[in-house]
Regions:
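Active-site-proximal loop->helix
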Residues: 12-29
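Short Gly/charged-rich anion-binding patches and loops
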Residues: 18, 36, 102
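Glycine-rich anion-binding loops and their surrounding alpha/beta cores
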Residues: 2, 24-31, 39-194
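Active-site cofactor/substrate anionic-group-binding motifs, chiefly glycine-
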Residues: 1-9, 13
Length: 194
């Protein structure tokens, strides 16, 4: 079975640049056609699908969202749900706690096999290493709501400064260190959780 991995390009609260920026700094070619992205997933089991290349309307939303400095429901929720890889397992981070149950209900309606909608109660739109995270887990058409915290996974809490990203080159260097086993601190723990 092929692992289908799609990382959307949204700068999170913990970083000033998105995943596409860091991947480009690592030398990854992100400006692929849908056919090239599909071929990568089929051949090696992983691929980065840059949303604007697959859904051109996202280019129209991405610019104003960046200029206004706001997150919209379109890019942060609808964008990941129209995943061109048609992945039925998903980890979806949302930027407001009230979006957790709403997004989970949408995932049920879209017949996702297994998904988690998460919101760090400290404001992160991902599973938080800083404190508690609200989770709505979708499995077999049912939604189970609960909270998790780093200690549930034998991980230590940290501060936002400990996991803050930076410019694309800083983030690329952090990724290299993580995958080389040179970083066993909060960045690693954050990666493990998400």
């Amino acid at each position: 079975k092929i692992l289908r991995l799609d990382i959307s390009d949204a700068a999170s609260i913990s970083s000033s640049s998105g995943s596409a920026d860091a991947l480009e700094a690592l030398g990854v070619q992100i400006d692929l056609t849908p056919e090239q992205g599909e071929k990568l997933i089929e051949e090696i089991g992983i691929g980065f699908l840059y949303a604007p290349n697959f859904h051109p309307v996202m280019l129209k939303v991405l610019g104003p969202e960046d200029q206004l400095g706001i997150k919209t429901i379109f890019f942060t929720i609808i964008g990941p749900l129209i995943n061109p890889a048609d992945a039925k397992c998903h980890l979806l981070g949302v930027y407001q706690p009230e979006l957790v149950p709403m997004a989970a209900d949408i995932l049920v309606e879209l017949d996702f096999t297994h998904a988690m909608v998460v919101h760090g109660l400290d404001g992160l739109d991902e599973i938080s290493i800083l404190g508690k995270t609200s989770v709505a887990e979708v499995k077999q058409g049912k939604v189970n709501k609960y909270e998790i915290e780093p200690e549930d996974f034998d991980l230590k809490r940290c501060s936002i400064e400990d996991v803050a990203g930076g410019d694309p080159q800083y983030n690329a260097d952090t990724i290299r260190n993580l995958y080389a086993g040179k970083d066993e601190g909060p960045h690693r723990d954050f990666l493990i959780l998400n």
